[in-house]
Design a protein with these regions (language model features):
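The feature captures the beta-strand-to-loop junction immediately N-terminal to the Walker
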Residues: 38-40
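Helix-to-loop junction immediately C-terminal to a conserved catalytic motif
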Residues: 53
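ABC ATPase NBD Q-loop/coupling interface
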Residues: 62-85
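Catalytic Walker B motif of ABC-type/P-loop ATPase nucleotide-binding domains
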Residues: 174-178
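A short, surface-exposed alpha-helical micro-motif characterized by mixed small hydrophobic
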Residues: 214-216
Length: 257
């Protein structure tokens, strides 16, 4: 196994009530990279994220994780919370922050994810934890907003807060489902820039439809079509491929995985 391999998806297939959602999918994700899954509606992109984090069990195949420090971990068959503890976290498309808590309190809850909500609220945050929260909020441009309620944040800011809530846990992999959804061009660009900063410390796997966003930050792109890997490579190879153009890039306006 190459030293820069962090995640290996091997021969993964999924069948839902007779429908073949994924067929023999093989993907290798490199350490400290931003790896995109793209494809038209129903291609299997979000299902693949579900397989990685154990929300969905594959019909066949497996997913293996190669942490920086430690032995190979087989994620397939593990409980979702155990995968989080291994260092694989996920942010869904719709922000799920606690809107009645401040930005800082949301960060504290995420940092103490192994505790209950009320335990986390009343637990005294250490100076080291406060410093980590401040540093993380600065990375996403919310350091001056930490004392306001999350309900007061704009849509893009809520997305950045939730990304920060994942990153503060010091994961090795962050899974993102359409992080730029609902954003204007300036917010989308800023999201890309903060993800490029974050990838210095962890790997990011993204499901996305916005091709400008993909072009901005992708290190590797896996194109899915009808549950199979159509091709994989850098964004320039993907954009130049006539088959990809025919089945995906020529089908604009699609927003759902």
């Amino acid at each position: 196994m190459e030293k820069d391999t962090l995640l290996k998806i091997k021969n993964v297939s999924v069948v839902f009530d007779g429908f073949q959602a994924l067929t023999d999918v093989n993907v290798t994700v490199k350490r400290n990279s931003i790896h995109f899954f793209i494809g038209p509606n129903g291609a299997g992109k979000t299902t693949l994220l579900d397989i990685i984090c154990a929300k969905t069990k594959p019909t066949g195949g497996n997913v293996s994780f190669y942490p920086m420090h430690g032995e190979k971990v087989r994620l397939t068959g593990m409980k979702e919370y155990k995968i989080v503890k291994e260092g694989v976290v996920r942010k869904f498309q719709v922000p799920s922050v606690f809107v009645n808590l401040t930005v800082e309190e949301n960060m504290e809850l995420s940092l103490k994810g192994n505790k209950g909500v009320w335990q986390s609220i009343f637990h005294r945050t250490s100076e080291e934890e406060k410093a980590l929260i401040d540093e993380t909020l600065k990375k996403v441009g919310l350091e001056k907003r930490k004392d306001i309620l999350a309900s007061s944040l704009a849509h893009g800011e809520k997305q950045w807060l939730e990304i920060a809530m994942q990153f503060v846990q010091k994961p090795e992999i962050i899974l993102l489902d359409e992080p730029a959804a609902g954003m204007g061009k300036p917010e989308t660009f800023k999201t890309g820039e903060l993800l490029k900063e974050i990838k210095k410390e962890c790997t990011i796997i993204v499901v996305e439809h916005d091709m400008d966003f993909v072009k901005q930050i992708a290190d590797c792109v896996t194109v899915l079509h009808e549950g199979k890997v159509l091709m994989e490579g850098d964004i320039h190879q993907v954009l130049a491929d006539e088959t990809v153009q025919a089945v995906y890039l020529g089908r604009g306006g699609e927003r759902n995985a």
